[in-house]
């Protein structure tokens, strides 16, 4: 019975070749487009899903101009004292971290010099709030002291090769010369994370 249905369907397709080809191609294109869109949506919705819930980002509304009717823009910025102040005044806030970023950050280790696309200066609480994987070192206290650094696997490979970088120093030559002690190694940041960095430096260094 089913075999006959297939025969009839095949005959109809063969009899109306052009019409059938248009339908089949249209169906194939539609299904392919649907799959691509669903994959894109799933990827976008996966961003930062590996982090613990109840994380909130403070934004700042800036007014462009002096008039109260001047246009406003919302930016992901806040004053550095805001975190400690809010924590002190609102017991509901369990923790906070500040992020100050820099890009094309030059780092030197002996005779090796590299430019890191993105680095963060963060509070020691950064890895208590965000669930980035620490492979080696103390993720909870590794950024507590000034001039401490935690670097990704990729950065460690570029600077130290196969050697253990824990306890070794790296130096930034910029407006000021700053030396950091490596206290930990982190897994490379997943692509589906909004926070992309190659190294974390102690906020207390600033």
Regions found by a protein language model. Give the residues of each.
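Short, strongly hydrophobic transmembrane alpha-helices
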Residues: 16-49
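A short amphipathic helical element positioned immediately N-terminal to and/or at the very start
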Residues: 5-14
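N-terminal hydrophobic targeting signals that begin at the initiator methionine
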Residues: 1-3
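Generic structural signal for small/hydrophobic residues in well-ordered secondary structure
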Residues: 13-16, 23, 44, 58-64, ...
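Mid-to-C-terminal secondary-structure elements
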Residues: 123-135, 149-206
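Short acidic/polar micro-motifs at solvent-exposed secondary-structure junctions
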Residues: 62-75, 97-125, 135-149, 172-180, ...
């Amino acid at each position: 019975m089913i075999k006959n249905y297939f025969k009839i369907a095949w005959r109809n397709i063969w009899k109306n070749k052009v019409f059938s080809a248009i339908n089949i191609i249209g169906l194939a294109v539609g299904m392919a487009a649907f799959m691509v869109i669903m994959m894109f949506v799933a990827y976008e919705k996966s961003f930062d899903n590996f982090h613990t819930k109840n994380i909130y980002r403070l934004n700042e509304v800036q007014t462009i101009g002096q008039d109260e009717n001047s246009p406003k823009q919302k930016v992901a910025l806040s004053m550095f004292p805001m975190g400690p102040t809010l924590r002190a005044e609102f017991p509901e806030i369990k923790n906070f971290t500040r992020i100050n970023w820099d890009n094309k950050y030059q780092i030197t280790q002996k005779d090796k010099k590299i430019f890191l696309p993105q680095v963060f200066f963060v509070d020691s609480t950064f890895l208590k709030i965000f669930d980035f994987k620490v492979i080696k070192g103390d993720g909870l206290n590794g950024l507590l002291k000034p001039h401490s650094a935690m670097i990704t696997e990729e950065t460690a490979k570029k600077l130290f090769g196969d050697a253990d970088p824990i306890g070794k120093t790296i130096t930034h030559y910029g407006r000021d010369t700053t030396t950091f002690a490596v206290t930990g190694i982190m897994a490379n940041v997943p692509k589906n994370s909004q926070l992309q960095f190659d190294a974390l430096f102690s906020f207390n260094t600033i």
